[in-house]
């Protein structure tokens, strides 16, 4: 008597804590290294996003390509969506990096939008680096009306793939609708031919796969409609076209930013805060002068 008693809920909580401690203790050095690696990539990607630095963004690209792409071949895939739909998730103990990547992707999308697409995806990072290295004279920019229609293609692909999978249970369809497998260097002649065509086309149309064909991008685009922290717009954005012309993703239409297409690349946000480029700041700087001239 007089001794505190534990409820069933308290006992369950203690057991869960013991299981977590046991799980962490049972991890081998390779698994710990994987956790450190994914945390480093995700952490630096977010740091570069917060700082709005072009140099840091390209370092983040290099980390994603090297680690998530070439070393681990670990990208968010339509296969992950299949697994979630089936409730067929990997065991937590030996799949912590997977849960960290998926968790970060979903949470960051809800908070800021398609940050994964614009900063972390190894294939997206690769195409953005290629776009910077290749001569701009090779580039073909689709007219705005066509660009906005082509952007719907990825949603059709996502819907078609999901219907196919739910009807057949064949997850191998992913090999023909996304090129992420190429980092494993394991594909047949048809798959490599499709990837070759895609990469050649990307030389001429920047971010072609990400903008028009990526089913994962489509899924994250749908989630982005609920994004909490969106890019602000000034009143002058009604008529100014500077950010719209600078956007490489076709996500800006006049004063509106399509959150489903925006990958938070930072380009417009750097202009947005540049007092020498952004019309909003230029107008504010001229107002005091105008008032002085009027009063005199």
Regions found by a protein language model. Name each.
Residues 3-254, 260-296:
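Non-ligating segments of multi-cofactor redox enzymes
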């Amino acid at each position: 008597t007089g001794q505190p008693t534990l409820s069933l809920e308290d006992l369950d909580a203690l057991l869960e804590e013991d299981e977590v401690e046991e799980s962490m203790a049972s991890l081998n050095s390779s698994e710990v290294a994987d956790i450190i690696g994914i945390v480093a990539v995700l952490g630096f990607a977010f740091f570069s996003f917060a700082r709005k630095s072009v140099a840091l963004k390209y370092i983040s690209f290099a980390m994603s390509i090297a680690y998530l792409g070439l070393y681990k071949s670990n990208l968010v895939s339509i296969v992950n969506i299949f697994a979630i739909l089936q409730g067929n998730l990997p065991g937590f103990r030996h799949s912590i990096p997977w849960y960290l990547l998926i968790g970060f992707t979903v949470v960051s999308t809800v908070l800021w939008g398609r940050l994964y697409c614009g900063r972390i995806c190894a294939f997206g990072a690769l195409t953005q680096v290629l776009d910077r290295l290749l001569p701009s004279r090779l580039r073909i920019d689709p007219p705005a009306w066509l660009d906005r229609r082509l952007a719907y293609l990825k949603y059709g692909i996502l819907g078609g793939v999901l219907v196919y999978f739910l009807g057949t249970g064949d997850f191998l369809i992913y090999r023909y609708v996304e090129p992420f497998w190429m980092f494993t260097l394991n594909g047949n002649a048809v798959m490599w031919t499709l990837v070759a065509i895609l990469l050649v086309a990307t030389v001429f149309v920047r971010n072609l796969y990400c903008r028009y064909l990526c089913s994962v991008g489509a899924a994250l685009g749908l989630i982005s409609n609920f994004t909490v922290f969106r890019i602000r717009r000034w009143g002058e954005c009604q008529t100014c076209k500077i950010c719209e012309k600078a956007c490489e993703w076709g996500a800006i239409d006049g004063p509106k930013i399509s959150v489903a297409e925006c990958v938070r690349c930072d380009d417009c946000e750097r202009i947005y805060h540049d007092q020498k480029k952004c019309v909003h700041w230029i107008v504010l700087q001229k107002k005091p002068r105008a008032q002085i001239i009027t009063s005199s």
